[in-house]
Amino acid sequence: MGVIQTLDSLMTNPMPEGRVEDILRPEGENPLLEKGYVTTSVDALLNWARTGSMWPMTFGLACCAVEMMHAGASRLDLDRYGVVFRPSPRQSDVMIVAGTLVNKMAPALRKVYDQMPDPKWVISMGSCANGGGYYHYSYSVVRGCDRIVPVDIYVPGCPPTAEALVYGILQLQKKIWRTQTIAR
């Protein structure tokens, strides 16, 4: 019985702590069902729409890319979170940098980042992307992709599990929800 409980805890998908406020709340008071309309701010509406439709572009450079592909497979099913991988930077709003970034690839990373439409976010996945990792002291390795592009979420590990990436994506959704889109 203890083994089954352990397996059940491994098979569950991670959820970020704290409540993510949603316009349509299934429990408690629901203003749409009670009054027939919802009042909200433009910021809240835009952020609500963005958290449900994140389109990441993969920038897989090493072994972390295999775990990124695993996260997109059927077991974890990122589609249910509104995450659909896109092949082009012009169609995506999230970049996942996974793996060792070398000096020769740094200009290409920046060029692809600049081609993404605003607003854009970056997830740094793995020890190599976060700070150079195992190859930190190599002459050709960039010691963290945050030296090239601004990073919003860091996913630690060597390589991080697919569940860790899903947790990082959920944390990014919470961060998007809290940002103010339109300056007052």
Swiss-Prot record:
<dbReference type="GO" id="GO:0005886">
    <property type="term" value="C:plasma membrane"/>
</dbReference>
<keyword id="KW-0408">Iron</keyword>
<keyword id="KW-0830">Ubiquinone</keyword>
<keyword id="KW-0813">Transport</keyword>
<feature type="binding site">
    <location>
        <position position="63"/>
    </location>
    <ligand>
        <name>[4Fe-4S] cluster</name>
    </ligand>
</feature>
<dbReference type="GO" id="GO:0045271">
    <property type="term" value="C:respiratory chain complex I"/>
</dbReference>
<keyword id="KW-0411">Iron-sulfur</keyword>
<dbReference type="Pfam" id="PF01058">
    <property type="entry name" value="Oxidored_q6"/>
</dbReference>
<dbReference type="InterPro" id="IPR006138">
    <property type="entry name" value="NADH_UQ_OxRdtase_20Kd_su"/>
</dbReference>
<dbReference type="GO" id="GO:0009060">
    <property type="term" value="P:aerobic respiration"/>
</dbReference>
<keyword id="KW-1003">Cell membrane</keyword>
<dbReference type="GO" id="GO:0008137">
    <property type="term" value="F:NADH dehydrogenase (ubiquinone) activity"/>
</dbReference>
<keyword id="KW-0874">Quinone</keyword>
<dbReference type="GO" id="GO:0015990">
    <property type="term" value="P:electron transport coupled proton transport"/>
</dbReference>
<keyword id="KW-0520">NAD</keyword>
<dbReference type="GO" id="GO:0050136">
    <property type="term" value="F:NADH:ubiquinone reductase (non-electrogenic) activity"/>
</dbReference>
<comment type="subunit">
    <text>NDH-1 is composed of 14 different subunits. Subunits NuoB, C, D, E, F, and G constitute the peripheral sector of the complex.</text>
</comment>
<dbReference type="GO" id="GO:0051539">
    <property type="term" value="F:4 iron, 4 sulfur cluster binding"/>
</dbReference>
<dbReference type="GO" id="GO:0048038">
    <property type="term" value="F:quinone binding"/>
</dbReference>
<keyword id="KW-0479">Metal-binding</keyword>
<protein>
    <recommendedName>
        <fullName>NADH-quinone oxidoreductase subunit B</fullName>
        <ecNumber>7.1.1.-</ecNumber>
    </recommendedName>
</protein>
<dbReference type="GO" id="GO:0005506">
    <property type="term" value="F:iron ion binding"/>
</dbReference>
<keyword id="KW-0997">Cell inner membrane</keyword>
<dbReference type="InterPro" id="IPR006137">
    <property type="entry name" value="NADH_UbQ_OxRdtase-like_20kDa"/>
</dbReference>
<feature type="binding site">
    <location>
        <position position="64"/>
    </location>
    <ligand>
        <name>[4Fe-4S] cluster</name>
    </ligand>
</feature>
<comment type="similarity">
    <text>Belongs to the complex I 20 kDa subunit family.</text>
</comment>
<keyword id="KW-1278">Translocase</keyword>
<keyword id="KW-0472">Membrane</keyword>
<feature type="binding site">
    <location>
        <position position="128"/>
    </location>
    <ligand>
        <name>[4Fe-4S] cluster</name>
    </ligand>
</feature>
<comment type="function">
    <text>NDH-1 shuttles electrons from NADH, via FMN and iron-sulfur (Fe-S) centers, to quinones in the respiratory chain. The immediate electron acceptor for the enzyme in this species is believed to be ubiquinone. Couples the redox reaction to proton translocation (for every two electrons transferred, four hydrogen ions are translocated across the cytoplasmic membrane), and thus conserves the redox energy in a proton gradient.</text>
</comment>
<feature type="binding site">
    <location>
        <position position="158"/>
    </location>
    <ligand>
        <name>[4Fe-4S] cluster</name>
    </ligand>
</feature>
<keyword id="KW-0004">4Fe-4S</keyword>
